[in-house]
């Protein structure tokens, strides 16, 4: 049961959301206590893991049709939908308790809102339109808001708005490339794909990468990332643009995956 629950919760993917929440903590001008950083990491990771589990319950019919997902515990019958729902619910409740216990009411409320959007808007929309990822990216941009509010930050502060906006921009090419990689799987499951001309090498994709790259440069420009971390951080968006125009999709996908970690590292180095 433990092994199946671990596969259901997808801890590595959930941890990326937790790391993004840490970015929000590290933005705090007066610095964040280690207890708040740990709480943000743990709470958001648990919420993301629980959300992933409930998403798999809702999409178990699709997962059975796709090569990359048919070995998940629900399609294989290793877990029942009821058991998976219970595991996901426990993870979500644990995450909310952690966030409420350290940050008051706002962090868990934001987390609940993100989960409701992800499961109530994105998951059903995924079956209807390829543009569903534009909606799904909203919930993926929320973790830094949780980390920021747990330190007492205001949601209208331009720094957290910029970081959350960058995470939104980052997710689109990331999942775009993922869709291109598994296009046959999506067709097999009957999920809508982007139009044939809209590929990783298309002008609209390059424009999006360019917008994301330009946005990342705003962090050093506004002093959000500075010191010794700034030069290396500025080199990252330039690398993305070069990879996008060279059509090195594998390298571009791998580089995009590093962005949340790179941002957290850069914010940590200037503390």
From Swiss-Prot:
It is an enzyme of class 2 (transferase). It is a multi-pass membrane protein. GO terms for molecular function: protoheme IX farnesyltransferase activity. GO terms for cellular component: plasma membrane. Its main location: membrane. The keyword Ion transport does not apply. Its EC number is 2.5.1.141. It catalyses: heme b + (2E,6E)-farnesyl diphosphate + H2O = Fe(II)-heme o + diphosphate. Pfam families: UbiA. The keyword Cell membrane applies. It is found in: Cell inner membrane. Keywords: Cell inner membrane, Cell membrane, Heme biosynthesis, Membrane, Transferase, Transmembrane, Transmembrane helix. GO terms for biological process: heme O biosynthetic process. The chain crosses the membrane at residues 31-51, 79-101, 105-122, 133-153, 160-180, 190-212, 228-248, 249-269. InterPro entries: Protohaem_IX_farnesylTrfase, UbiA_prenyltransferase, UbiA_prenylTrfase_CS, UbiA_sf. Signal peptide: none annotated. Pathway: Porphyrin-containing compound metabolism; heme O biosynthesis; heme O from protoheme: step 1/1. Carbon 2 of the heme B porphyrin ring is defined according to the Fischer nomenclature. Converts heme B (protoheme IX) to heme O by substitution of the vinyl group on carbon 2 of heme B porphyrin ring with a hydroxyethyl farnesyl side group. Belongs to the UbiA prenyltransferase family. Protoheme IX farnesyltransferase subfamily. This is Protoheme IX farnesyltransferase. It comes from Geobacter metallireducens (strain ATCC 53774 / DSM 7210 / GS-15).
